[in-house]
Amino acid sequence: MWENRRTNEGAKSVTNEEVVMAGDRERETARTSTSSGLPLSQEYGPESAAGRPSDATGTAGSYPYTRGVQPTMYRGRLWTMRQYAGFSTAKESNARYRYLLEQGQTVLSVAFDLPTQMGYDSDAPEAEGEVGRVGVAIDSLADMEQLFDGIPLDKVSTSMTINSTAPILLALYVAVAERQGVSRAALSGTTQNDLLKEYIARGTYIFPPAPSLRLITDVVEWSSAELPKWNTISISGYHMREAGATAAQELAFTFANAIAYVEAAVARGMQVDAIAPRLSFFFAAWTDILEETAKFRAARRIWARLMKERFGATNEKSLLCRFHVQTAGSALTAQSIDNNVVRAAYQALAAVLGGAQSLHVNGKDEALALPTEESARLALRTQQVLAHEAGVAGTVDPLGGSWAIEALTDTIESEVLALIAETDRLGGAVAAISAGFPQRAIQDAAFAYQRDVEGGTRVIVGVNQFVDEAVTTPPIARIDPTREREQVASLKSFRASRDTAAVAERLDAIKVAARGSENLMPHLISGVKAGLTVGEISGALREIWGEYRESLVL
């Protein structure tokens, strides 16, 4: 979220007198469209359902799963509270994970620093100043062991938000499990492993699309045989939404990428029903409760129909759109950060009303820095209050049947399908990205949003209306700069302890496999066990495949 966070700088502020007048105006008028610009009727009724297929909604746990992927939803099991965390060194992040587990979090979600995401070791010139800043620095197997020290990997589910270097980090995770005596069959978790959205919005790509798709498919193929409980790709709309996409664009470009991944796996010889059950999704939750709830309902219906009608899937699990939700980082403001607590709570409510399987709530200070421990705890408590006090988890799809929600669900579905059809017309996701189609659409939506903010037609409380005159500087988390030097020293010590002949042999084996068509995962696991670092493996693959250079899209 850091790279793409929308800013509200330059937006007009108002005086206290103007605030009172604005309050009067707010009582008289309200927005007539959703946050994404979909028109809202003043009142919805039975006529809004005219022409809707009788099976469009159904019941939870049955096709097309509009109302939920399980019959009982949260009555059977609450959503997973998966707070995203990671900073500085493996030792410090390990302490934060233990703290979160002690506070009631049930799973882990790992944030990696930019050098790790981009395939650079901590002592690389490109990494200087970025080590441990926006996530944890992981260079080697020693770091990965430290990260999960005292945390049995067969007792937790771990999500790793990592893309270009996802196969390497997964190899490190598997190697740590082996050292803990944990079988591969017992490992559960997720690698994001979604490169196509990096070309569209986020930008942490290394290799061109073709070898990137090959790496993704290697992970899917290997994991389907070796890690039966592992979600091999978390296909992500979140980052595109953070870059400015509308709700419909978020779903459409996510599903277009998912289609490309499934087609690549099928072309490798895999069966749809062997791989699709381990695909999961990652979406954003914005503050527009009605639109977001409808979006999540539409997502389930669209994916179920795509898998059944387009790919011929017959396994019920292949049809399920299981998704993680994170509240919208780009909706947080640097001004009046206490308002962000309210925003995040409403966003979390939308995720739960929409039937999310897991949820991360952002800390109130994340427009400024990584969250403090206090902020992270409050974010977790927000989820716990929502789960145990708000009364929204006791019935399945509580807004289902609302004329407004059903109409918005249909409208979003229609827009999504039109965008997928246009992507298909261009030749699929990879060709559409090369043509700049999704990038341009998102840029246009982001521009329209910011224009409305700066013009005052879109109210951002505390930014362009209802501005607090008293400005305070909240305490924020800061990364100790000495930690970077410690990480570099630790890396050098690790390198000095290795069997250099074994390291060279394993690196050569990876290069040979990369030039051919052999699955790279076994070679990566052998390599990290021999002592190869993230940067060394990434550097070797750069030699073989080159680096992707983004084209300017206007």
Predicted ranges, named:
Residues 106, 149-153, 175-183, 217-229, ...:
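Generic secondary-structure signature for well-ordered alpha-helical cores
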Residues 4, 22-50, 59, 63-65, ...:
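Flexible, glycine-rich loop/tail regions that form catalytic "lids" or insertion modules at the edges
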Residues 236, 252-261, 268, 277-462:
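Active-site capping/gating regions of soluble enzymes
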Residues 2-286, 291-292, 310, 317-326, ...:
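Catalytic alpha/beta active-site cores
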Residues 60, 91-95, 138-142, 164-171, ...:
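Conserved active-site and cofactor/substrate-binding residues in soluble primary-metabolism enzymes
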Residues 138, 151, 162, 168, ...:
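Weak global preference for isoleucine
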